[in-house]
Amino acid sequence: MSQPVVVIDAKDHLLGRLASTIAKQVLNGQKIVVVRAEALNISGEFFRNKLKYHDFLRKATAFNKTRGPFHFRAPSRILYKAIRGMVSHKTARGKAALERLKIFEGIPPPYDKKKRVVVPQALRVLRLKPGRKYTTLGKLSTSVGWKYEDVVAKLEDKRKVRSAEYYAKKRAFTKKVSSASAAASESDVAKQLASFGY
């Protein structure tokens, strides 16, 4: 990756594999924005992953619970914590790397109008055997206390309507341009120019 900012659509990616790829890239100096974090997948059935998260929720400082560890419920923060664990975040280099990273639920402006990419080596369909169980991160987050799944879903529905309208307009415009260029190439002027060797 060697673009100013790369926007990754996290839908149907495996959490750990995507996190490792992003960690490597931000350490190399690449700015990355991750959208649709709630649509990430984790291998394994929902109930087992929920038990693992509840095991994590029990971990706390013995004498003062406010000192951490902090149990983030939002999908964006769960992904952030996975990436942070793969970066030496206490050094200046690690802090600078994490500042190059932004993670969002849904696709907020202005990233709804930017080109989004996927990470093939982290896609569930290419990495998980067909028929194996997997968990959606948004569902897991909601089960442990994340309150904004419905809000994000509502905003995503609105965005998809706008996106469909834009795509329909773009297709119509492309069709007009191609038909006009085809008509122009078949015109008498083009034939005359061809006769003169142009």
Curated annotation (Swiss-Prot):
The modification N-acetylserine is found at S2. Keywords: Acetylation, Cytoplasm, Isopeptide bond, Phosphoprotein, Ribonucleoprotein, Ribosomal protein, Ubl conjugation. GO terms for cellular component: cytosol; cytosolic large ribosomal subunit; nucleolus; ribosome. Pfam families: Ribosomal_L13. Transmembrane segments: none annotated. There is a cross-link at K176 (Glycyl lysine isopeptide (Lys-Gly) (interchain with G-Cter in ubiquitin)). Component of the ribosome, a large ribonucleoprotein complex responsible for the synthesis of proteins in the cell. The small ribosomal subunit (SSU) binds messenger RNAs (mRNAs) and translates the encoded message by selecting cognate aminoacyl-transfer RNA (tRNA) molecules. The large subunit (LSU) contains the ribosomal catalytic site termed the peptidyl transferase center (PTC), which catalyzes the formation of peptide bonds, thereby polymerizing the amino acids delivered by tRNAs into a polypeptide chain. Component of the large ribosomal subunit (LSU). Mature yeast ribosomes consist of a small (40S) and a large (60S) subunit. The 40S small subunit contains 1 molecule of ribosomal RNA (18S rRNA) and 33 different proteins (encoded by 57 genes). The large 60S subunit contains 3 rRNA molecules (25S, 5.8S and 5S rRNA) and 46 different proteins (encoded by 81 genes). Belongs to the universal ribosomal protein uL13 family. This is Large ribosomal subunit protein uL13B. The lineage of its organism: Eukaryota, Fungi, Dikarya, Ascomycota, Saccharomycotina.
